[in-house]
Amino acid sequence: MAEVQREFVMIKPDGVVRGLVGEVIRRLERKGLKIVALEMRQLDRETAEKLYEEHRDKPFFEDLIEYVTSGPVVVMIVEGRKAVKVVRNIIGATDPAEAAPGTVRGDFALDIGRNVVHASDSPESAEREIEIVFGKDLSTIDYERCDEEWLYES
C-alpha cells in the first residue's frame, strides 16, 4: 500500500483574481485528494523569500517575489496516496507552453510567470514549505472521505 503524503499547494494571485480557486480545488478533490488545511492570505516578503529560497540566485527571483506578494493567495495542504506526484500531474508542467491540455496550467495559463498555482516538487519540499507557510504548530483537520474505500485498493 502506498504511503499517504501531504502536499503543499498555493493558488497564486493570478489564479485568485481570475476566479480559479474553486476550479483548482474541484480538480484536487475530484481526483480523491483531501484538503486538510486551507487559508486565504497575503504573503509577506519574508515568507515568500523562504518559500522560493532555491531560486534566490536566479534572474527572475525578484519578479517572482514581487508577484506572489502582490495579491491574495490561497494556501492549502492536501493529503492522499502519492499526493505529491498526483498534484503535480493535475497542475501540469511549470511552463504552461509545455503543460498538457486538461491540466490546470495547460487549461488556464499562458505565461510561466503567471502560471496559476504552485505545488511542492517532492515530499521533502512539501514538508519544508508547509512549515514555512503554516508554521511548526500546524493544526490540520483529520477526516475520512465517504468515498475513500472506493478510491484505493487495501
From Swiss-Prot:
Molecular function GO labels: ATP binding; metal ion binding; nucleoside diphosphate kinase activity
Subcellular location: Cytoplasm
Reported function: Major role in the synthesis of nucleoside triphosphates other than ATP. The ATP gamma phosphate is transferred to the NDP beta phosphate via a ping-pong mechanism, using a phosphorylated active-site intermediate.
Designated name of the protein: Nucleoside diphosphate kinase
Keyword flag Nuclease: no
Disulfide cross-links: none
Pfam family, one: NDK
Active site: 118
Entry's family note: Belongs to the NDK family.
GO biological-process terms attached to the record: CTP biosynthetic process; GTP biosynthetic process; UTP biosynthetic process
High-level lineage: Archaea, Methanobacteriati, Methanobacteriota, Methanomada group, Methanopyri
PROSITE patterns: NDPK, NDPK_LIKE
Signal peptide (UniProt feature, chain positions): none
Highest rank taxon of the organism: Archaea
EC number(s) on file: 2.7.4.6
Binding positions (ATP): 12, 60, 88, 94, 105, 115
Keywords (A to Z) from UniProt: ATP-binding, Cytoplasm, Kinase, Magnesium, Metal-binding, Nucleotide metabolism, Nucleotide-binding, Phosphoprotein, Transferase
Gene3D superfamilies, sorted: Nucleoside diphosphate kinase-like domain (3.30.70.141)
Cofactor: Mg(2+)
